[in-house]
Curated annotation (Swiss-Prot):
InterPro entries: HemC, Porphobilin_deaminase_cofac_BS, Porphobilin_deaminase_N, Porphobilinogen_deaminase_C, Porphobilinogen_deaminase_C_sf. HAMAP family: Porphobil_deam. Pathway: Porphyrin-containing compound metabolism; protoporphyrin-IX biosynthesis; coproporphyrinogen-III from 5-aminolevulinate: step 2/4; Porphyrin-containing compound metabolism; chlorophyll biosynthesis. The lineage of its organism: Eukaryota, Viridiplantae, Streptophyta, Embryophyta, Tracheophyta. CDD domains: PBP2_PBGD_1. GO terms for cellular component: apoplast; chloroplast; chloroplast envelope; chloroplast stroma; plasma membrane. This is Porphobilinogen deaminase, chloroplastic.
Amino acid sequence: MDIASSSLSQAHKVVLTRQPSSRVNTCSLGSVSAIGFSLPQISSPALGKCRRKQSSSGFVKACVAVEQKTRTAIIRIGTRGSPLALAQAYETREKLKKKHPELVEDGAIHIEIIKTTGDKILSQPLADIGGKGLFTKEIDEALINGHIDIAVHSMKDVPTYLPEKTILPCNLPREDVRDAFICLTAATLAELPAGSVVGTASLRRKSQILHKYPALHVEENFRGNVQTRLSKLQGGKVQATLLALAGLKRLSMTENVASILSLDEMLPAVAQGAIGIACRTDDDKMATYLASLNHEETRLAISCERAFLETLDGSCRTPIAGYASKDEEGNCIFRGLVASPDGTKVLETSRKGPYVYEDMVKMGKDAGQELLSRAGPGFFGN
């Protein structure tokens, strides 16, 4: 393991001071070895060993810590530079090495960090920035232009329409889709006193919180990576926050969790907990590599959920949740939700059918069309 990989779980611990009633333990927030990112209170002594290069196309190319290429890389992985994004890139790299002996040699796989629009604009809520692909566009452009060979994305960030000249032939096995409640003074949302502020940039989370707990307040401009948001919580900017349990597991930071919300309490985002890996349409070699890693059960579930999202034309301005899973009999169970941003109205639906691609896509679309019809014009403007 190189220094960059180990830094995710070792260096620079930040202690969250809990109140007497809290069930939250102290945590190790880790450090990031990345170029071109300003992450508060996070540093690494390995940074000095990296060099930053500016390409003619304007995107930042960066090595990760001391991950030096000993020869021309067979695969260049493009990723964002957050600790979670790097953890996902490392997971991809290790799975490729396990499957393909020719990729084991040092330098055979190189990681390129690319800064996205969502990384650059941190002062506004995502809903105010607008547009799609806030965390993927620049990485996809690097892929199309040949600067990288594969792009590792959090699937929940991937627009329903992929950029031209790209395909997404691989979903890694999905992590836990539920949301985690993080708080220094209470174990659950229900225990928070009236007027407490919950920090989340997600309209999906905001609408479901306010629907069930209208006495709480939500701070929308609560952005940044996991470490940054935990630091804001520690600093008293908010009393609690919700984070994807999948990300906390990948960062080995579940000790921060006060409780885990059930699917009835908080339906997840479409594709939450899933990693998607894209390549160029004409790159058969990379497509073959990625196909060898694909987890078909995850891919089918994501296809159902994204068909639902596409039907609703969902974006960061729309509170939408959806989750497809396989039951004990092997059937697909899909649950979908749309809400008004203020949480006063929530519409839900569900479907059950064969766990087969065509049937699951049809279920997702049908569920989306039902909720569109029930919502009516002006629903999302409330």
